From Swiss-Prot:
Region (Disordered): 286-352
Alphabetical UniProt keywords: Ribonucleoprotein, Ribosomal protein, RNA-binding, rRNA-binding
Taxonomic lineage: Archaea, Methanobacteriati, Methanobacteriota, Stenosarchaea group, Halobacteria
HAMAP family linked: Ribosomal_uL10_arch
Name of the featured protein: Large ribosomal subunit protein uL10
Residue stretches of biased makeup (Gly residues): 343-352
MF annotations from Gene Ontology: large ribosomal subunit rRNA binding; structural constituent of ribosome
Annotated Gene3D superfamilies: 3.30.70.1730, 3.90.105.20, 6.10.140.760
Assembly notes: Part of the 50S ribosomal subunit. Forms part of the ribosomal stalk which helps the ribosome interact with GTP-bound translation factors. Forms a heptameric L10(L12)2(L12)2(L12)2 complex, where L10 forms an elongated spine to which the L12 dimers bind in a sequential fashion.
Other noteworthy facts: Was called L10e in this organism; in this case 'e' is for E.coli-like, not eukaryotic-type protein.
GO cellular component labels: cytosolic large ribosomal subunit
CDD domains, per the entry: Ribosomal_P0_L10e
Keyword Ribosomal protein: yes
Length: 352
């Protein structure tokens, strides 16, 4: 170590060493660490936010040079946060994920009064209604800043919502005083996250500003679509294998019933199907004497089974008619052969 380096090391106060050590310990304790902007936050609101984050996140303020030194010494990529250490900032650390941290900080923001000389973050409106202030000079102050105010029913009334300063304009002394008198706090103060580092990834506020419920619904919808695609494409995965097996079993059973494949698993269904077909066929025969005794006075099965049975019966009837027609043709052919033989015998007798 050179004399200059040794002299520089000796000049570092002990309290700074201790401060950096505590900051490094904080950085190494939590999963997610961010840099937040605290500019313009009154001490009261800052303390309220610190209490609101208690148990969920830790907020630590220090000199920027010490924050940078701690981020560099902690390593593991945390030094990427040093670019955000500028102005009035602090470190916030949590075991929550970056999206959860962002939501915590947004929810911790509170309304605050605005001072003269500040830029209006949005349109500043004096709302319609009773101000609760007795008649006096204050009505003139309201009118001076552009509020439609009158004395009515023994008090100062604002007759309609009045924009007294538009977004982006500088707040005047008169507007600041009137707002303070009315107890209107037009701006929102809170810890603005500049960047957060978690599990080796640096996140910006723009990346974290999402609707968590909507995002969760999108993920669930995508997962359901992927599952359906896997099942319909017969692509087995750990999650879809049970569904594919159940689907295959159902399709195999349906095919077995349609093809009347003999199987112990299909025996009961095949017997039920055959019974329905027999009953449907028996119901189509008008002559009960032509039926076995056990099939006499039977009713046709229910509509679904009956439709299937009727189709089968019609097919069988068509086959029977076709068979009878074939038999008739054969009989005609036999008769023709007999007639031909008889004619030949007659000619033989005629010509000796």
């Amino acid at each position: 170590m050179s004399a200059e380096e040794q002299r520089t090391t000796e000049e570092v106060p002990e309290w700074k060493r201790q401060e950096v050590a505590e900051l490094v310990d904080l950085l190494e304790t939590y999963d997610s660490v961010g840099v937040v902007n605290v500019t313009g936050i009154p001490s009261k609101q800052l303390q309220d936010m610190r209490r609101g984050l208690h148990g969920q996140a830790a907020l630590r303020m220090s000199r920027n040079t010490l924050l940078v030194r701690a981020l560099e010494e902690a390593g593991d990529g945390l030094d990427t946060l040093t670019e955000y250490v500028e102005g009035e900032v602090g470190l916030v650390a949590t075991n929550d994920n970056p999206f959860g941290l962002y939501q915590q900080l947004e929810n911790s923001k509170t309304p605050a009064p605005i001072n003269a000389g500040e830029v209006a973050p949005n349109d500043i409106v004096v709302p319609e209604g009773d101000t609760g202030i007795d008649p006096g000079p204050f009505v003139g102050e309201l009118q001076t800043i552009g509020a439609n105010a009158r004395i009515q029913e023994g008090s100062i009334q604002v007759l309609d919502d009045s924009v007294v300063t538009e977004e982006g304009e500088t707040v005047s002394d008169d507007v600041s005083n009137v707002l303070s008198e009315l107890g209107i706090e037009p701006k929102e103060v809170g810890l603005d996250l500049r960047g957060v580092f978690s599990e080796g990834v640096l996140f910006t506020p723009e990346e974290l500003e999402i609707d968590v419920d909507e995002y969760r619904a999108d993920i669930q919808s995508a997962a359901a679509s992927a599952r359906n695609l896997s099942v319909n494409a017969a692509y087995p995965t750990e999650r879809t294998a049970p569904d594919l097996i159940a689907k295959g079993r159902g399709e195999a059973k349906s095919l077995g019933l349609q093809a009347s494949v003999e199987s112990p698993d299909l025996a009961d269904d095949l017997v039920s199907k055959a019974d329905a077909q027999v009953r449907a066929l028996a119901a189509q025969i008008d002559d009960e004497d032509a039926l076995p005794e056990e099939l006499q006075d039977v009713d046709a099965p229910a509509a679904p089974a009956g439709g299937e049975a009727d189709t089968t019966a019609d097919e069988q009837s068509d086959e029977t008619q076709a068979s009878e027609a074939d038999d008739a043709d054969d009989s005609d052919d036999d008769d023709d052969d007999d007639d031909g033989n008889a004619g030949a015998e007659g000619l033989g007798e005629m010509f000796g």
